[in-house]
């Protein structure tokens, strides 16, 4: 497509089913959450299934947008690269704690000393088999999708353990609590991308499904772009579609 031409996603149900949404063009920069947006949510993080046409569709969109497409996710970098192999896209992983524009990943945040949080989460999971502890480079996530009745216990356990760690905050997602460095969020990751080519000078669009994506919606809309919320629930995003890829 020539500059200013249309890279139309409206016909591409493999990315999302557009529902009265503005048309994406080559003047846009596209940022996509992963879980719940490009894939359906699964009981465990490793159980996510990638639709057969998703990788070629993302590759095509990346080319049509002149490289201005990035995944912005809470997952570790290795997870995304594994699910989307052999495709390697620009990526902000762990909510922006790790940042990859081209081939080299740059840690944006130093790992905090999370041992007290990790120990508390692991001890709780050992007593309740439905819980899952996920250790990332700069954070600890406690998943309770298989034990939703333990939500309050998970929350209180992590809050108590966080008192022993400086510079962290609790992030609530869909059936998960995550202890991460304070100030690290998807909005900052998107803002950082927008200062660099090929993203700079474009209108940003961010698609996400979770409360963890609200900072991303705020960032793109502050930059004159638009957010798309996938699914139900309150949001500051200007647009909504009801289904993921």
Each model region followed by its residue ranges:
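Active-site phosphate-binding/coordination module
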Residues: 49-136
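Residue-level signal for inorganic ion chemistry
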Residues: 36, 91, 142, 190, ...
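A common structural junction motif
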Residues: 125, 160-167
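Mg2+-dependent phosphoryl-transfer enzymes with acidic/Ser/Thr/Gly-rich catalytic loops
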Residues: 51, 187-245
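Short amphipathic alpha-helices in soluble, non-transmembrane regions
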Residues: 117, 121, 154-162
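Charged, glycine-interspersed solvent-exposed loop segments at helix/strand-loop junctions
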Residues: 131-148, 167-180
């Amino acid at each position: 497509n020539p500059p200013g031409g249309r890279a139309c996603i409206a016909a591409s149900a493999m990315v999302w089913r557009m529902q009265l949404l503005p048309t994406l063009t080559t003047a846009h920069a596209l940022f996509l959450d992963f879980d719940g947006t490009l894939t359906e949510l699964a009981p465990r993080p490793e159980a996510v299934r990638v639709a057969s046409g998703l990788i070629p569709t993302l590759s095509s969109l990346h080319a049509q947008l002149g490289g201005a497409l990035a995944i912005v996710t809470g997952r570790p970098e290795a997870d995304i690269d594994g699910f989307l192999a052999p495709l390697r896209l620009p990526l902000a992983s762990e909510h922006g704690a790790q940042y990859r524009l081209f081939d080299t990943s740059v840690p944006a945040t130093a790992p905090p000393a999370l041992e007290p949080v990790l120990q508390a989460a692991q001890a709780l999971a050992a007593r309740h088999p439905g819980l899952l502890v996920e250790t990332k480079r700069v954070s600890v996530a406690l998943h309770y999708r298989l034990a939703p009745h333990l939500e309050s216990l998970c929350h209180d356990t992590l809050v108590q353990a966080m008192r022993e760690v400086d510079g962290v905050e609790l992030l609530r997602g869909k059936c998960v609590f995550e202890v991460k460095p304070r100030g690290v969020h998807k909005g900052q990751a998107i803002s950082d991308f927008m200062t660099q080519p090929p993203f700079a000078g474009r209108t940003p669009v961010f698609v996400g499904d979770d409360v963890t994506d609200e900072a991303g919606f705020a960032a793109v809309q502050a930059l004159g772009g638009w957010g798309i919320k996938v699914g139900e629930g309150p949001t500051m995003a200007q647009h909504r579609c009801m289904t993921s890829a």
